[in-house]
Amino acid sequence: MPINRLQLNITSLASDETTWKKPKTIAIIIAWSVINVGILMYVFLFAGQSMEWYFMTLLFAVSVYAGAILEDIKAIILGGFEALALTIILAYVLMIIPALIGQISGFYQQNLVLTIALGFLFRMMFPLGIVLIVIGGLIGGLLEGWLT
């Protein structure tokens, strides 16, 4: 009986490391984003309109740790930008929830909330936030490679 070309070889699939790294990489990127969103939301709700140095240090430390866990330079670079995009999207959605659910009445008031949230994210993430997240991930990957 001839073997179909589309038939999977289970033993080679089980021995392939990249197959099992994919869910781990996705989980790390999501966790990286959620922690970054937590830091940004704390600043948005309690710390005012300026991001102090210790919040930037937290963003950098989380990125170093995520880069050390990810290990692969390609996963770190792509994952850093994916985490950054997911962070911005999640933080923006969380900031505009009152306008989305109708707690803020009036078209102009809703647009004001959307504009304030976008302005806050722009001030917090561009350019220093992006640089800290990407460079922190790269440094974490380099540290992990150097320590092993």
Annotate each language-model stretch with its function.
Residues I101-F120:
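Membrane-interfacial helical/loop segments at transmembrane boundaries in membrane proteins
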Residues A75, I116-I139:
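Hydrophobic alpha-helical transmembrane segments
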Residues M1-N9, G141-T148:
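Short, charged juxtamembrane terminal tails flanking transmembrane helices
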Residues M56-G80:
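Canonical alpha-helical transmembrane segments
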Residues K74-I97:
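Hydrophobic alpha-helical membrane-insertion segments
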Residues P2-F55:
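N-terminal signal-anchor transmembrane alpha-helix
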Residues V43, A47-G48, K74, L94, ...:
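Membrane-interfacial segments
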